[in-house]
UniProtKB/Swiss-Prot annotation:
Catalytic subunit of the periplasmic nitrate reductase complex NapAB. Receives electrons from NapB and catalyzes the reduction of nitrate to nitrite. The gene is napA. The keyword 4Fe-4S applies. It comes from Mannheimia succiniciproducens (strain KCTC 0769BP / MBEL55E). This is Periplasmic nitrate reductase. Its EC number is 1.9.6.1. NCBIfam families: NAPA, PRK13532.1, TAT_signal_seq.
Length: 830
């Protein structure tokens, strides 16, 4: 009997499931074991990173019993990383929260009370009463906040935006993508007039060179790394450059391994631009037709509190994002100081390596893709450094074509689809629209059938400012969903924890587990995970993927979508809207926000799905209509017709995702390029149609120093990040026994010479100390991460070692994104 690849992959998963159940399967029956065992298989995107791998989910008796790589998925082609192979276990930790828990004392809510089980109605009543009291007292909707995630589904993100920005009229809603992707998003919008990459993963098989900037793809995007490895090892002409402030596993494949001093990537990129100009490698035909030059503001500060000395000294803090009209000659002058010698002096990179790198970008015969993640984005000049990599691709014309382009990789499964495309940032609306643009607001109010003026044009508090506003009493209600900011946010000691425990504030956390955030909150709402609900994600290559609900959540767990929509029933329009607004649409008087936002004739127009026997949809059962479909089709109307086109809802359930814009059923692989993008007209060749003149911006900005550097007392650089086995704060992965055993606790990686100078040895218990806090860990001088002298590396997955007690809450002044990669630290024996 023949066994094809798909059956082989399914058989592997069946064997794994059988082993977990303690049974054996006859070899002759292994290919059909899933049917014999009663396991049902269905597709879903992986719950972890932004790669967007598809997995097949095996369910039996109401539980997920196995997962496997999806052989029909173009992204991962049947492969999973180590985290993906154990997806079936993330929902079954022994400590799942299964009922709402409210801090209570003497039978009522008390900030210092003990967590006590309550009903959903009690929980929502406490929340609604607090919000109504704030609105009545402060008359400022931005005093009520939501902090969410690039892990919530597209449907959930859209429902949140409607409730917060339209219903409660607050723009204080921000995702944790502010911590990881804001600089990339801002630079995309500023450069091209539209967000998200122009290329796709197909570039990997078509390029001649890969340059990784601050990205350990071997551990953080391992399936993409497997494709890069295959491409590199299949051709001697293909080269890999890996750039980082320390050596990690991606260096094993590097032809040119480059270690640079923290923050000096700015100088290196300006050197490359200068090299291209000085060696007459500018693609003038491309530059003249498709680009324009601007000059950025300088001396813009570091996103710290206004009274901080660095902010007081910054001359242009209030105009940080301004760009001035310029020309090539001025740009040439801006990059001219960044000679080979100067770039070497600032970065510490050997001159021959810098020159090799510059020649690769300059060579018109060599296709090249730049990949980057947090090393670029978590940067007090993250917007600038994103601009700079676009600069070198635009100067050479290596962009928007197969095998050539700048590619920002996302770290969360729907940082693109939910946070960016839906617009769950304080300043955004769906499809790249913003609250500060009256035309965009008018479009949103028309689609949502709202009175004119409902949506505020004042952005709310973004992520780091939310923490400060809670501490200062300017923000008095925060609902956190699907993230763990008490562990993942910066400067926990000084900024986050004080605001959460401020007696005037109510903090609500929706979480499936008692995370650091949950136990610090006032109210915990039990949340369904992954395939316990129907969902959709959007990955790093603009691919939108759907999945069906496979199993039910435990106890009283409810999806974030159910929580948001059900909560809207607790407000009547008179309680949250002004008389002026109600006078425009008197038919809304006496109605709940649920009726106005979700029973509006659009969201509720699709009936409960009946063509998928055997599947459940808890939201459809509770609300009486196909909520996910209604939300998606209304959301999609924002983008159709102007470059953000999505396919119809039902199509996504039939395919392994489509890359937008999707026009006439066809996805787009390379945006802005004639022959691939339906929005580029015949004869245009390239059209950056995000701007009316269809030209991208080349921005001239300099190198500027970091916010904090080592000194005599705090004499080392601290860089924080992740490891392969765990994801973010470990809320899921630390509850998977195999992953926990593989890497049980955080470590501090240090160069052996630095350890010897401090009288330390491998394995020693050490204390890391910064100006903000301290942490106990164990020293590693021999492991996978090899730090240069003067720098240490640690991770933030371990709730027993809160690395973000150490980090500085400096941000990029333009994007508001946190710099987790650079602050000063000292290390002593504990």
């Amino acid at each position: 009997m023949e066994l094809n690849r798909r059956d082989f992959m399914k058989a592997n998963a069946a064997v794994a499931a059988a082993a977990a159940a303690g049974i054996t399967i006859p070899v002759k029956n292994v290919h059909a074991a899933d049917d014999d065992m009663g396991i049902r298989w269905d597709k879903a995107p992986c719950r972890y990173c932004g790669t967007g791998c598809s997995v097949l989910v095996g369910t039996k008796d109401g539980r997920v019993v196995a997962t496997q790589g999806d052989p029909d998925a173009e992204v991962n082609r049947g492969l999973n990383c180590i985290k993906g192979y154990f997806l079936s276990k993330i929902m079954y930790g022994a400590d799942r929260v299964q009922t709402p828990l409210l801090r209570m004392k003497d039978g009522k809510f008390h900030k210092e009370g003990d967590f006590t089980p309550v009903s959903w109605d009690q929980a929502f009543t406490v929340m609604a009463d607090k919000i109504k009291a704030i609105l009545k007292e402060k008359k400022d909707p931005n005093a009520i906040g939501m902090f969410s995630s690039g892990q919530t589904t597209i449907f959930e993100g859209y429902a949140k935006v409607k409730l917060w920005k339209a219903g409660l009229r607050s723009n204080t809603i921000d995702p944790n993508a502010r911590h990881c992707m804001a600089s990339a998003a801002v630079a995309f919008l500023r450069t091209f007039g539209m967000d998200e990459p122009m290329g796709c993963y197909n570039d990997i098989e078509k390029t001649d060179a890969f340059v990784l900037w601050g990205s350990n793809m071997a551990e953080m995007h391992p399936i993409l790394w497997s494709r890069i490895s295959d491409r590199r090892l299949s051709s001697d002409k293909v080269k890999v450059v890996v750039m980082s402030t320390f050596e990690h596993r991606s260096f094993e494949l590097a032809d040119t391994p480059i270690i640079f001093k923290p923050h000096s990537d700015l100088a290196i990129l300006n050197y490359i631009a200068n090299y291209i100009i000085q060696n007459d490698k500018v693609n003038w035909d491309f530059v003249n037709k498709h680009t324009k030059f601007k000059r950025g503001e300088t001396d813009i500060g570091y996103g710290l509190r206004p009274e901080h000395p660095l902010e007081v000294a910054a001359k242009n803090r209030k105009t940080a994002g301004k760009m001035y009209d310029s020309d090539f000659e001025e740009f040439k002058k801006i990059v001219a100081p960044y000679t080979l010698e100067e770039a070497h002096r600032i970065s510490g990179v050997p001159k021959d390596q810098l020159e090799t790198l510059a020649k690769m970008y300059a060579d018109p015969q060599q296709n090249l893709v730049s990949f980057w993640t947090m090393g670029f984005n978590q940067h007090t000049r993250g917007v600038w450094v994103n601009h700079m990599v676009y600069n070198v691709h635009l100067l050479t014309g290596k962009i928007s074509k197969p095998g050539c382009g700048p590619f920002s990789l996302t770290g969360q499964p729907s940082a693109c689809g939910t946070a960016r495309e839906v617009g769950t940032f304080v300043h955004r609306l769906p499809a790249d629209m913003v609250v500060t643009n009256p035309k965009h607001v008018e479009i949103a109010e028309n689609i949502w059938k709202l009175p004119k003026g409902t949506i505020s044009n004042k952005p709310g508090f973004p992520a780091v400012q939310q923490s400060r506003a809670l501490k200062d009493g300017k923000l008095n209600f925060l609902w956190q969903l699907c993230t763990n900011n008490m562990q993942g946010g910066p400067n926990i000691n000084e900024e986050i924890f004080p605001g959460w425990r401020n007696p005037d504030n109510l903090i609500v956390v929706s979480d499936p587990y008692p995370s650091a955030s949950a136990v610090a909150a006032d109210l915990i709402l039990p949340t369904c995970m992954w395939v316990e609900k129907e969902g959709a994600y959007g990955n790093a290559e603009r691919r939108t993927q759907f999945w069906r609900q496979q199993v039910k959540g435990p106890g009283q767990s409810r999806s974030d979508l159910w929580q948001i929509v059900e909560f809207s029933k607790y407000f009547k329009t008179e309680e949250v809207w002004s008389e002026e607004l109600l006078a425009q649409m008197p038919e809304y008087r006496g109605k709940t926000l649920y009726e106005v936002l979700y029973l509006n004739g659009e969201v509720n127009k699709f009936q409960t799905p009946t063509n998928v026997p055997g599947y459940i949809n808890d939201e459809a059962e509770d609300f009486g209509f196909y909520l996910q479909k209604g939300l998606f089709e209304e959301y999609a109307s924002f983008g159709r017709g102007h470059g953000h086109d999505l396919a119809d809802f039902d199509t996504y359930h039939q395919v392994r995702g489509l890359r937008w814009p999707v026009v006439d059923g066809k996805e787009t692989l390379w945006r802005y390029r004639e022959g691939y993008d339906p929005y580029v007209k015949a004869g245009e060749e390239v059209s950056f149609y995000g701007y009316p003149d269809k030209k991208a911006i080349i921005l001239g900005v300099p190198y500027e120093a970091p916010a904090e550097s080592p000194d005599e007392e705090y004499d080392l650089w601290l860089c924080t990040g992740r490891v392969l086995e765990h994801w973010h704060t470990g809320t899921m992965t630390r509850r998977v026994p195999e992953l926990h055993k593989a890497f049980p606790n955080n470590l501090c990686w240090m160069h052996p010479t630095d350890a010897k100078k401090r009288g330390l040895r491998h394995g020693d218990k050490v204390k890391l100390i910064t100006r903000r806090g301290e942490m106990i860990s164990h020293l590693d001088t021999r492991g996978r991460n090899k730090c240069p002298e003067g720098l240490i590396y640690t991770t933030f997955f371990d709730a027993g070692q809160l690395a973000n007690k150490l980090t500085l809450d400096a941000t990029d002044p333009i994007s508001g994104e946190t710099d987790y990669k650079k602050c000063a630290v000292k290390v002593v024996k504990a």
